[in-house]
Structure formats: structure tokens, C-alpha cells
A protein has these predicted regions:
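N-terminal auxiliary interaction/assembly segments of multi-subunit proteins
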Residues: 1-172
């Protein structure tokens, strides 16, 4: 078992590094380009968009949100599928869920190489305005912003101890 220390307002580097490496690798394979990292900004929201959420438990308990504003979701879904997927179509949820699932599987593998054992949940997909989970005060979180094919993508990571995380059980 790896010793992952959770400090107040700080995401462990092994998590952020694995997430950053994963989005670069997976999006390069799927979309043909490495996402451009635009920095961290916890005050920036996605507006009207769709979000794929995966929880991880094990040596570290945390949540990953892969968020796409409406126009980003439509453009990237079309590239991923090879045909247009309307934003309001239920298939959009399947596309975003699959992207989150593929990325999460890659993250689990990368963390395993680092000696960190985690299991992932099935994806939950939500659509709406500035969709984010409510978490207890003091739980570290981080929003990482990227540009892919000229479109915004946001990743939010929320890390905590197992007893602090809501919905942290895989399959929950």
C-alpha cells in the first residue's frame, strides 16, 4: 500500500501527474493532438456543459470530473464518433461517459506503475449549468483547464480521505 499524504488544500503530485499524463496521451490517441494546458483556475466554470465523473478508491480516494462546455462537447464528440452527436441527444452522455472511462482506466494503470493501487467506478454523466459536486469544507480540489482542437476542456480533481468522499465507492 502506498503512503499518499493528503494535506489541506493540496492535491498529491502523483494524482495530478498521472491525470496530466493521461489527458495528454489519451486525447492525442483519440483526437490526434496533445491538449494545450491553460493553467489551473478554481474560479472558472464551464457554463452550460456536460460532465463525466469517475470516483477512485484505494490507496487514495478521489473524484475526477471531465467537463466540456456545450460547443466543446459537440465538436469533440463528432471527432470521437466520426459523426455529429447533438448536445441534447442521450448519445452525448454515452460519448462523454466513454471518454471519462477510457481516461480513468489509463489513470489507474499509470498510478499502478507508481505503486498506488486504486479502483475506479463506472462513469456518471451530468448535463447542466456549472455542474459540480458539493464537498465538505477543506477538501482539496483543483480545476485544470485545457484547449483541444480550439475547444475548452476542464478537469476537476477532488481528493479526500475515504470517510470524507461522497460517492467514493466504485459502482456507487
Amino acid at each position: 500500500m502506498a503512503d499518499i499524504e493528503i494535506k489541506e488544500n493540496e492535491i498529491p503530485g502523483v494524482i495530478t501527474n498521472c491525470v496530466s499524463d493521461s489527458i495528454s496521451s489519451i486525447f492525442k490517441k483519440i483526437f490526434g493532438v496533445v491538449p494545450e494546458y491553460d493553467g489551473d483556475d478554481n474560479s472558472k466554470n464551464i457554463g452550460d456543459g456536460v460532465v463525466g465523473i469517475i470516483s477512485f478508491v484505494g490507496d487514495a480516494s478521489w473524484i475526477l470530473m471531465l467537463a466540456f462546455p456545450k460547443d466543446s462537447a459537440e465538436k469533440l464528440a463528432e471527432k470521437f464518433c466520426g459523426f455529429k452527436v447533438p448536445y441534447d441527444n442521450p448519445d452525448m452522455g454515452d460519448v462523454i461517459g466513454e471518454l471519462a472511462n477510457v481516461m480513468a482506466g489509463d489513470i489507474v494503470a499509470r498510478m499502478g506503475v507508481q505503486g498506488v493501487k486504486v479502483a475506479m467506478s463506472l462513469p456518471t454523466v451530468l448535463r447542466g449549468q456549472n455542474v459540480e459536486p458539493f464537498m465538505a469544507k477543506g477538501i482539496p480540489d483543483k480545476k485544470m483547464h485545457y484547449t483541444v482542437m480550439g475547444k475548452d476542456v476542464m478537469i476537476k480533481i477532488v481528493v479526500g480521505n475515504s470517510n470524507e468522499m461522497m460517492g467514493a465507492t466504485p459502482g456507487a
